[in-house]
Amino acid sequence: MKVSAALLCLLLTTAAFSTQVLAQPVSISTVCCFNVASRKISFQRLQSYRKITSSKCPQKAVIFKTKQAKKICADPKQKWVQDAMKYLDENSRTTKYSSF
């Protein structure tokens, strides 16, 4: 009887700890920009972009990906950055519709 009670306690303890481990959130890495491009990048070199708005980052930024797979941080307040995002948005829309 003592052995079965001890086994039951061990089983319940193991079950309690395993559910706590499973319930923990998955760690997602945050990408931040600490320096931004100081000059304009040719729109034709750009392939895509991603906005960085995480509160964990020191500043808001846009990461442009070039056709050569380089990633470049830029200040989203600058006019050329806004124009580049608009250019990429329009090109991606045109590409989607022209494939029919």
UniProtKB/Swiss-Prot annotation:
Note the InterPro entries from the entry: Chemokine_b/g/d (IPR039809), Chemokine_CC_CS (IPR000827), Chemokine_IL8-like_dom (IPR001811), Interleukin_8-like_sf (IPR036048)
What are the GO cellular component annotations? extracellular space
> Which sites carry carbohydrate?
94
Q: What is its main location?
A: secreted
Signal peptide per UniProt: 1-23
Q: Where does the protein end up?
A: Secreted
UniProt GO MF annotations = CCR chemokine receptor binding; chemokine activity
Q: What GO biological process terms does the UniProt entry carry, in alphabetical order?
A: antimicrobial humoral immune response mediated by antimicrobial peptide; chemokine-mediated signaling pathway; eosinophil chemotaxis; inflammatory response; positive regulation of cell migration
Question: What keywords sit in the KW lines?
Answer: Chemotaxis, Cytokine, Disulfide bond, Glycoprotein, Inflammatory response, Secreted, Signal
Q: Specify the superkingdom.
A: Eukaryota
User: Secreted among the record's keywords?
Assistant: yes
Q: Name one Pfam family in it.
A: IL8
- Disulfide connectivity for this sequence is 32-57, 33-73
Q: Which family does it belong to?
A: Belongs to the intercrine beta (chemokine CC) family.
**Role of this protein:** In response to the presence of allergens, this protein directly promotes the accumulation of eosinophils (a prominent feature of allergic inflammatory reactions), but not lymphocytes, macrophages or neutrophils. Binds to CCR3.
Q: What is this protein called?
A: Eotaxin
